[in-house]
Amino acid sequence: MCINPADEQDYESYSLRMTAHLIESSSVTSFTATRLNQTTFRLVEDDRHIERPMVYVKLYATCVVVIDTGCNSPRNTELPVTSLRRFIETVPLDQNESMPLNPDGRLPYYILLSHCHYDHIGGLESFQGSPYHIYCSQRLSETIANSRLHHDSLRESCSLPPLELDLEKMTGVPDGYSLVDANSVELNLQLLHAPGHSPDHMVVLDLDESTIFLGDSAYEQSPLFYAYGGDLTLHIQTLARLETLLTTYETCEGAPIWTAACGHFSSGLNAVSLLQRTKTFILDVIEGKVPSRSQEANPYQSGGVLEFFTRDELAMACPDHLLKDARGSSISLCSS
């Protein structure tokens, strides 16, 4: 989330303190890598916006899947390696047998975007000149085709330059799309539309590792944030749908517990529990059961107000007009 300069120092100090455990001090790179599971690494970017976005890199024999791409805005611009692609191709990792994740870019990239916000798409330009293809929701592909990406991504609000993207290297996929490699071999990754945080949001199910990549649908330790097109009612319905889906998977005999890998701050959590708790928290905010902690001017809506709510590990920064819409909605807010 971009903030007003007057608030920057307090917000920066708070964010640095809350996320210090995610970042290793380095004289080489703005990324910190840890192994998430047998096939996947989590990269955390030390960015100047203090978003600390999480990028996931899943390794296959035929390709490298990258889920989100971070900000491409290093907090320390003097570091030798601040490009996501360069990190993946050149920085050796102890947890990867002292090899880079994709040495010299030998394998093609399949890039999956959870949604359009600047802290998830900023690293896309680093992949130009390499073999890559981008997969996103159909809604996001429409946003790009209609020349709304600079606005809807918040890059305009954050005074960031427009991204230059090759539309021929992008595919907007339907809900439930199964990803395959260049030889039409299933990668056991399913892409699901998941609106709420933003209208173009999607999540990724890794059926091999029983991991759900949630983007900004749910996480702990930092406020869930809503900007253009956010919808609390849709968000609750999305969380309920995902909770039901994963619960169904887990009821199969011998099935593993699903793990959540989030876009910020949280990974390795019990996915069903996180979805349940987030859904209940948002519903309780709408119903007035969680008091507003503070209010400030909404940087994305003239005359609007952002309200802040917290409970236990969860928090929310929500425009007041979205709360009014949800409280006045005739749609059932909780389907379970």
From Swiss-Prot:
It is found in: Nucleus. It comes from the Eukaryota. The keyword Glycoprotein does not apply. Its main location: nucleus. Keywords: DNA-binding, Nucleus, Transcription, Transcription regulation. Pfam families: Lactamase_B. GO terms for cellular component: nucleus. Disulfide bonds: none annotated. One of its GO terms (biological process) is secondary metabolite biosynthetic process. This is Putative transcription factor avaE. The gene is avaE.
